[in-house]
Swiss-Prot record:
Keywords: DNA-binding, DNA-directed RNA polymerase, Nucleotidyltransferase, Sigma factor, Transcription, Transcription regulation, Transferase. One of its GO terms (biological process) is DNA-templated transcription initiation. It comes from the Bacteria. The keyword Lipoprotein does not apply. One of its GO terms (cellular component) is DNA-directed RNA polymerase complex. This is RNA polymerase sigma-54 factor. GO terms for molecular function: DNA binding; DNA-binding transcription activator activity; nucleotidyltransferase activity; sigma factor activity. Sigma factors are initiation factors that promote the attachment of RNA polymerase to specific initiation sites and are then released. It holds the Pfam family Sigma54_CBD. Residues 356-375 bind DNA. Belongs to the sigma-54 factor family.
Amino acid sequence: MQQLVQQQRLVLNQRLVHGLCLLQLSRGDLKTEVLRAVQRNPLLEIRPSSARRTGKACYLSLGDRRERMRARDRFQQLLENQPDKQVDNIRAVLREQVFYQKHEAIVLDLACAFIQMLDDHGFFSISPAIFQNMCGSMPTALQEKIPQAIALIQRLEPQGCAVFNFKESLAVQARLRFERFSDPLYRCVINLLTHHSELLFCSDNMCDGRVSVHALTTQINSMGLCVQKVSSNDVKDILLLIKELHPFPGKCVSNAQRADTNMLLEPDVLITKTAHGFVTQINCTGIPTVVFRNDYCMHSKAAEKNHALKACMHDALSLVSMLSYRERTLLDIAKTIVHYQCGFFDHGPAKLTPLRMTDVAHRTGLSVSTVSRIVRDKWLQYGSQHFSLRYFFSPRVLSTEEYRDRSSLGQNYPSSPHSKVSVKYRISRLIQEVRTQRISLSDRRIAQLLGEQGIKCARRTVNKYRSELRTCSSS
């Protein structure tokens, strides 16, 4: 008896891979990619601005002396509002996420201990032999929890930490990101990075040379690394997927901190307050406007028979469509952030509410991975201040009861209306208020003062936040 089975799956193609890459590009990288695409494709051109077409000069007009004084005050406020840079490292970022995971306390404690052994790349700073001997000397109850603790760290952002080298990191990232897809090329990527990394990298160090697409295609087919025969285009897609992974995940944190130290930033999103609420706009200044050249196709002879021209046409239309989709998606996510964080824009950091990427994804109808790609390296300007979009995603604060039973997070306790950023801001204000009186507040006293403001916060949480704020603690 014959059976008809209908299966729905995501099939990888060049356009999908390129679109995913465009979503996560920063403003500067996007401009570079657009200019590079226009140089390669004759069917694309950059539309000049109206000022360039008319030949008029672009300048800021300040009408009277009062307006000039206001502009000077705004610039002075911009200089004074530059925050004191506090550089985090990969260990601090991972340790913060472990605190909110739903696991047994023994697994969380093991994970925190292993995180302390990581270097700035996110790799273990000791050799595998020493690590194995150390784990072998632990009690049996702890040894049984070691795989769970390592797997927990590897799933945290940035993914791929708690390994010994970049090859293991890439294999872990590929498994976590691509294992849920049924497309054979995803399976091939996992197989390559897990069992046959020597085909991609010549040594334990990063290979500077490029991988030969033709040679890799032959090796994959001859060794049967994919369930189906792969072509050169398939291998190009495989290499693009691998390029999405980060060989040194710890550098993601250091690079983000380095970007934060730049004095001048070009925001991707502009927020302005009006009498009717907040207005969200995409900052198009400095980003080239790409258009499709219909006249080129009309004057080209035998355009339908020219396969090269048809390929350029397909790439041009795809790029214009993906840039439009990127702009719409960024605008939708920015509007959603403003919707959830309107208290922050009205009253400051003390009113920043807890927000997860899952909440934004649910409201916009997007996937969590798409939201994560969009907010990466994107900046928002409100007044004279700049904020990273990731700044608005802040976890909630744990109460004393939750701290005692961390394995029941999200199950037996209601969600807290206070975020980590808002509580840290309130703690810094409390410390500043008593500093002039030469009074030292203990962690327990700060927890009591926060409780009087309606914030149930554990003493250990206060101690952790004071350490991040670099303020001395007196128990």
